[in-house]
Amino acid sequence: MSNTDLEELRRGTDLVKRGFAKMQKGGVIMDVVTREQARIAEDAGAVAVMHLESVPADIRKRGGVARMADPGGLEDVIDEVSIPVMGKARIGHTAEAQILEATGADMIDESEVLTQADDRYHIDKREFTAPFVCGARNLGEALRRIDEGAAMIRTKGEAGTGDVNQAVTHQRNIQRSIRKLSGMDYEERDEWAREHGAPRELVHETAEMGRLPVVNFAAGGIATPADAALMMQLGCDGIFVGSGIFGAENPQAMGEAVVAAVNNYDDPETLKEIAKSPGKGMKGQANETLPEEEKLQDRGI
C-alpha cells in the first residue's frame, strides 16, 4: 500500500466527514453538561448531544474565559449514550480540538460560544479525522469554513439568549446570497468570490447546487418548539438547541416537543398541539438589549 493510501486511511476524507454530518439531517442536537442530561436528551429523541462545561446562558452569566470542557466529562457522556457525542473547542485552538478527537468526540464544534483563542486564524480542520461543525452569519463565512474542512455549518445566532432573531437573520442572509449567486453568470460569481473572500470553486458549486455543499443546521437562540419549526421552514437541515432544553421548566418535555416540532414543522395543526405540551421555556434576553462586547456572534472571521 502506498504512503498516499495510508495517509487517506489515517485521516477522514471529506466524503466520510460530510457523510457523518448528513446522518444528523432532520434531527435535533442538544447541549448537555452531565451524563444525566445526556440520558434525558437521548430519551427525548436527540440525534446527537453536544458536551460542554456550561450551557451558553450560564456562560454569559458567569463571564470570564470559557474553555473546552474537561475531557473526563466527555468520556462520561460517551459511556452513557448510544447516539453521537460532540465537543466544543475554542476558535483557532488546535490543541483543544486534538484533545477532543483523542477523547473520542464524534464531531467537534469550533465554537464562538467559547472564548476565541486566535483572532486571525481558524483551526485547519482538514488535518483531523473527526468532522467539524462551524458557525456562520453569512455565505462568505460559511464557504471559508467549508474550505478549511468543515463538514457542517450552523447559523451563529446569538447563543444563550433564547432570542431566535439572529438565527433567522443569519439563515436569511445565507439563503439570499445563494439565490443571488444562482442567477449570476460564471464571471459574476468569480467577482462575488473575490469581493467576499470566498473560495471560487465553492462559490460555483453552491450556485449550481442551489444550497450549501454541506448540511446547514440552525443554532443560537432557539428556545421553543415554534422556534425550531420556524428555522426548518427557512430551509435548515436540522436544529441545535443549547440553553433552551435544560433552561426550561421541564427539560424532558421541552426536548420531546422540540424534536416533535422539527418532525412536523410544516403541519400547523400538529404544531399547535406540540406547543401546548412542554411547559415554561427558558428566561430569555432580547438580542437588541445586548451590549456589543457581549455579542458572541462577532467572534471568528
From Swiss-Prot:
Disulfide bonds: none annotated. Belongs to the PdxS/SNZ family. PANTHER family: PYRIDOXAL 5'-PHOSPHATE SYNTHASE SUBUNIT SNZ1-RELATED. Residues 273-301 are annotated as: Disordered. It catalyses: aldehydo-D-ribose 5-phosphate + D-glyceraldehyde 3-phosphate + L-glutamine = pyridoxal 5'-phosphate + L-glutamate + phosphate + 3 H2O + H(+). NCBIfam families: PRK04180.1. D-ribose 5-phosphate binds at D31, G160, G221, G242, S243. This is Pyridoxal 5'-phosphate synthase subunit PdxS. InterPro entries: Aldolase_TIM (IPR013785), PdxS/SNZ (IPR001852), PdxS/SNZ_N (IPR033755), RibuloseP-bd_barrel (IPR011060). The lineage of its organism: Archaea, Methanobacteriati, Methanobacteriota, Stenosarchaea group, Halobacteria. D-glyceraldehyde 3-phosphate binds at R172. One of its GO terms (molecular function) is pyridoxal 5'-phosphate synthase (glutamine hydrolysing) activity. In the presence of PdxT, forms a dodecamer of heterodimers. HAMAP family: PdxS. GO terms for biological process: amino acid metabolic process; pyridoxal phosphate biosynthetic process; pyridoxine biosynthetic process. Its EC number is 4.3.3.6. The active site is at K88. Residues 292-301 have a biased composition (Basic and acidic residues). It comes from Natronomonas pharaonis (strain ATCC 35678 / DSM 2160 / CIP 103997 / JCM 8858 / NBRC 14720 / NCIMB 2260 / Gabara) (Halobacterium pharaonis). Catalyzes the formation of pyridoxal 5'-phosphate from ribose 5-phosphate (RBP), glyceraldehyde 3-phosphate (G3P) and ammonia. The ammonia is provided by the PdxT subunit. Can also use ribulose 5-phosphate and dihydroxyacetone phosphate as substrates, resulting from enzyme-catalyzed isomerization of RBP and G3P, respectively.
